[in-house]
Amino acid sequence: MTSSLSLHSSFVPSFADLSDRGLISKNSPTSVSISKVPTWEKKQISNRNSFKLNCVMEKSVDGQTHSTVNNTTDSLNTMNIKEEASVSTLLVNLDNKFDPFDAMSTPLYQTATFKQPSAIENGPYDYTRSGNPTRDALESLLAKLDKADRAFCFTSGMAALSAVTHLIKNGEEIVAGDDVYGGSDRLLSQVVPRSGVVVKRVNTTKLDEVAAAIGPQTKLVWLESPTNPRQQISDIRKISEMAHAQGALVLVDNSIMSPVLSRPLELGADIVMHSATKFIAGHSDVMAGVLAVKGEKLAKEVYFLQNSEGSGLAPFDCWLCLRGIKTMALRIEKQQENARKIAMYLSSHPRVKKVYYAGLPDHPGHHLHFSQAKGAGSVFSFITGSVALSKHLVETTKYFSIAVSFGSVKSLISMPCFMSHASIPAEVREARGLTEDLVRISAGIEDVDDLISDLDIAFKTFPL
């Protein structure tokens, strides 16, 4: 990296003119050039050309200044450098190799097609369905965050999950968790079987059930941890070992956690899905999905499906995600802290029967969760034992918007059995322990005291 500062007569008055007017010393420099050329190594800065100060001056640098420069160089030479920046730093320091002008905001390449160099030669891009610089910038960043070989952005989380199911052929099997997002459940129970794929549903928190379900025909194991909405925790490491022993891939829907809190690929998963609509974009203004994958062979298969099916994310939607993702770590930190305090308040409330949140010490999966994630996130649920009370809470609060989805800066509240999970038959929901009085909360970035007070008023206004 080289930066320079030069004074040219075409831009400023000559030094002679300034000197004649008494505005500058006769011994002032006629040219100033500063060149900074750091050579980075794994853990420290090399002392060779690590800091070069080049001044062309009539007056030589005095001994004190020379000593200061040497001391600065020595300090830089011995400074320990982290092997990798933290997520919050990576998010705002995107290496945008797609922009020749180094704009601070990644450019939006709002185009459907690209001019080619000749009739028989192709440029780096030809048609946005197949690739676009704005999408590539987002995918490159997401791959880095998830420690993936490649990442791919889709028009929604469900489009991303649908692409994964197309990796499985007629007669092969998918083993999937029984407590998953309602849209995923609909895809697995009503759409995937049409192609001749066998779907087995198990409680992924019970390793013996998972082991019994995985067989020679199993090609994919699909799980969420924590699950949506009941916050059940599965052992991603051990399930990955079981699946790989049979030659199956492992998919983890990591939408509730995001790359800030969990990296399932490092735990053994092969594919990680994010609904980028949620924490990645963070503002409820765009739909998007992500698949982050390990291995070039798998990456090529996923790209083939994305390109062939036309499910790649549009440039403007990619740009919105790039804008939102810069504050993801900051948002999640605040949202998670709010969720923890609200969950603690609810867990001690006499009208609440149970709170499902892995961040609470008495959660049965608490220790397992924190062995594979950095935090519990900001989505949780609770039951009251009364559908009427739950309905009153959802409808009476003024700072929680009644809406599906989660991960927005705005706090959201819902009753999953009537909203996000309504497509699951009632008898199936009941068998899985998904009761109609269940309330799901996605904590936003508001003042937590206002949110707790809002809930408290709602409880107090419900007739006994």
Swiss-Prot record:
Knockout consequences: Decreased abundance of several PIN-FORMED (PIN) proteins, involved in plant auxin transport, and impaired auxin-responsive gene expression.
Residues reported to bind pyridoxal 5'-phosphate: 127, 129, 157-158, 275, 277
GO cellular component: chloroplast; chloroplast stroma
Reaction(s) catalysed (UniProt annotation): L,L-cystathionine + H2O = L-homocysteine + pyruvate + NH4(+); an S-substituted L-cysteine + H2O = a thiol + pyruvate + NH4(+)
Gene3D superfamilies noted in UniProt: Aspartate Aminotransferase, domain 1, Type I PLP-dependent aspartate aminotransferase-like (Major domain)
Residue intervals passing through the bilayer: none
N6-(pyridoxal phosphate)lysine, modified sites: 278
Pathway where it operates: Amino-acid biosynthesis; L-methionine biosynthesis via de novo pathway; L-homocysteine from L-cystathionine: step 1/1
Cofactor list: pyridoxal 5'-phosphate
SUPFAM superfamilies listed in its UniProt record: PLP-dependent transferases
GO biological process: L-methionine biosynthetic process from L-homoserine via cystathionine; methionine metabolic process; transsulfuration
Transit peptide range per the UniProt entry: 1-55
EC number: 4.4.1.13
Keyword list, A-Z: Amino-acid biosynthesis, Chloroplast, Lyase, Methionine biosynthesis, Plastid, Pyridoxal phosphate, Transit peptide
Subunit structure comment from the entry: Forms homodimers. May form homotetramers from two homodimers.
Protein's job: Catalyzes the penultimate step in the de novo biosynthesis of methionine. Its role in methionine metabolism may affect plant development in different organs, probably by modifying plant auxin transport. Its cysteine desulfhydrase activity may be involved in hydrogen sulfur production using L-cysteine as a substrate.
PANTHER family: CYSTATHIONINE BETA-LYASE (PTHR11808:SF50), TRANS-SULFURATION ENZYME FAMILY MEMBER (PTHR11808)
NCBIfam families referenced in this protein's UniProt entry, alphabetically: cysta_beta_ly_E
Family of this protein: Belongs to the trans-sulfuration enzymes family.
Protein name in UniProt: Cystathionine beta-lyase, chloroplastic
Organism annotation: Arabidopsis thaliana
Upper lineage: Eukaryota, Viridiplantae, Streptophyta, Embryophyta, Tracheophyta
